[in-house]
């Protein structure tokens, strides 16, 4: 004769009060988590990694602007570098060209990429701005975490030998392209630079959360472009996945093309050229020397 078995608890036949209690507890837990998430506030006062430690600031004086805390590191590897910060004075009437940088982190994953804008003055001075996650010490970036108020946003103003150099000379997998932008048309380059600088100052006063979908390098570039030239960049998946941007760049005539899109992509790769730079010449001139931008067509 088998021993009597204790009846199993059927969750669908629990007393009404118990079901209600479990549901209420779960509901309140979700509400608490949402409220806690929404209560998080971004800050400019944390223990930042060295290359994100200082935040740039622009001081306007008529047509002149002084940009403080421009990064000018000398990178030997991603962890070995000489730290240097400089102030740079520019004349806003002398903005001559804008350059667009597209860095694929891994060529096998073409959706994921980083975008940078670089401003060239009539005297050849170039200053780049990389819109990034502002990392704390010991912190690593992950796109999923970027959805949940885990990183602040920063506009990193830097020399090209720093912000482009570290990508082309120190990263083994990444592939970096350099295009001359024609996104705004003549005369609007100054307004684009001013838009960037004013947003930089705003972030210094009111920090913001980075968001993997809504507040990234590329979504901010598009906002700046459309602020200066409304409707210039249409809505597209490539804004969320910047690695897909070459076709939208071609379709909307946003960069100078040198042949077909495939030929332009191949000719715009600057990694090997950057690796051969000896340091005796200007880095920006060196990576552009064989690009033939002046012979390209829109």
Which role does the model predict for each range below?
Residues 30-43:
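Internal alpha-helical transmembrane segments
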Residues 40-57:
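Alpha-helical transmembrane signal-anchor/signal-peptide segments
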Residues 10-27:
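N-terminal Sec-pathway targeting helices
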Residues 65, 76-176:
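Glycine-rich catalytic cores of cysteine/serine-nucleophile enzymes that process amide/ester linkages
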Residues 21, 184, 195-298:
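Activation targets extended, charge/polar-rich intrinsically disordered C-terminal tails
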Residues 23, 32, 59, 64-65, ...:
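Charge-rich, low-complexity N-terminal segments
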Residues 160-200:
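A structural motif
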């Amino acid at each position: 004769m088998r021993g009597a078995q204790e009846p199993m608890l059927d969750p669908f036949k629990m007393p009404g009060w118990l079901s209600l209690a479990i549901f209420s507890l779960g509901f309140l837990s979700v509400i608490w988590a949402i409220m806690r998430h929404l209560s998080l506030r971004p800050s400019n006062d944390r223990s930042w990694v060295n290359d994100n430690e200082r935040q740039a600031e622009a001081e306007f004086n008529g047509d002149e602007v002084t940009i403080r805390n421009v990064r000018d590191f000398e990178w030997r590897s991603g962890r070995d570098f000489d730290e240097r910060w400089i102030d740079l004075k520019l004349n806003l009437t002398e903005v001559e060209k804008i350059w667009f940088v597209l860095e694929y982190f891994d060529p096998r994953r073409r959706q994921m990429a980083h975008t940078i804008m670089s401003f060239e003055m009539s005297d050849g001075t170039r200053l780049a701005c990389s819109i990034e996650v502002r990392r704390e010490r010991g912190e690593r970036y992950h796109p999923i975490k970027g959805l949940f108020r885990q990183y602040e946003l920063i506009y990193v103003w830097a020399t090209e030998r720093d912000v482009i150099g570290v990508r082309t000379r120190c990263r083994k997998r990444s592939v970096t392209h350099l295009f001359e932008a024609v996104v705004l048309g003549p005369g609007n380059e100054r307004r684009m630079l001013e838009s960037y600088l004013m947003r930089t100052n705003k972030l210094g006063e009111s920090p913001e959360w980075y968001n993997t979908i809504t507040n990234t390098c590329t979504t901010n570039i598009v906002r700046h472009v459309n602020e200066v030239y409304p409707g210039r960049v249409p809505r597209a998946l490539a804004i969320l996945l910047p690695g897909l941007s070459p076709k939208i760049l071609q379709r909307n005539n946003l960069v100078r093309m040198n042949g077909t899109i495939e030929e332009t992509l191949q000719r715009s790769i600057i990694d090997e050229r950057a690796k051969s730079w000896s340091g005796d010449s200007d880095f920006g001139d060196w990576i552009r020397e064989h690009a033939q931008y002046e012979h390209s067509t829109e």
